[in-house]
Amino acid sequence: TLVANLPDIKTESEKEVALPPFLIEKWKKEGRYEKEMASLDAFFKITGYPRAPKYYIIKWLTDYIVEFGIDGYRADTVKHTDEKVWAAFQKECNYAFGVWKKNNPSKVLDNNSVYTIAEVYNYGISGGQEFDFGDKKINYYQNGFNNMINFEFKWDAQKDYEFIFSKYSSKLNNELQGYSVLNYLSSHDDGGPFDAKREKTIESGTKLLLSPGISQVYYGDESGRSLVIEGTEGD
């Protein structure tokens, strides 16, 4: 599975660690060791963070924002990391975005901050701001995310239009006010999509695009491409 193959980086740790030798070797071969080390030194001096694994990752991801002006991140398998890391991540993303805007005034489109979306597997809008692990509940919205993928929408799509609109409007204008959800009907790792045979394409599109929240359009949603293909395996 995906999770079984993820790198075992201890995002909950605050313990300082050295860079892995293979990365140092790579940088030296590429002739950029001194530049990368100076950049790391500057980041840790400005932020005051310890040189723990998560802060290295935050630094490298926010470098993309400074260089390219990336204005959003979609984080995968969030439940398998320590939730507090994302608050620090969002903070540094917004700082980096400010640096990019200052350096590129002619390219600035608006005053928005970096937009962050969390994939917390099986989160549904009915849970409001919290995801229930069974033994604990975590509020990812208050730990650095503007939006969470809503795994519940494909089930709600089986209901009528009034039910969907009323439910989602109520949720997003009350306990989720200021935040949002990302709705989908089919996805690469969801084995039970709504209308897999694409027999309700107009209904699917209407519900997905007109329901409160953000819409994810998956490959084939727009063209009615069937998801039932004999002989296929995996994603």
Residue ranges of model-derived segments:
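Substrate-binding/active-site clefts of carbohydrate-active enzymes
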Residues: 1-63, 67-68, 89, 93, ...
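Catalytic grooves of carbohydrate-active enzymes
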Residues: 65, 187-189
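Active-site rim elements
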Residues: 44-50, 74-77, 189-199, 205
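Short loop/turn segments at secondary-structure transitions that flank enzyme active sites
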Residues: 15, 122, 155, 190-191, ...
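Short, basic/glycine-rich phosphate-binding loops at helix/coil junctions
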Residues: 184
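Hydrophobic, well-ordered secondary-structure elements that form the walls
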Residues: 188, 208, 220
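Acidic/polar loop patches that form or flank catalytic/metal-binding clefts of enzymes
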Residues: 215-221
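Active-site-proximal helices and loops of the catalytic beta/alpha 8
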Residues: 59-181, 197-200, 206-211, 223-235
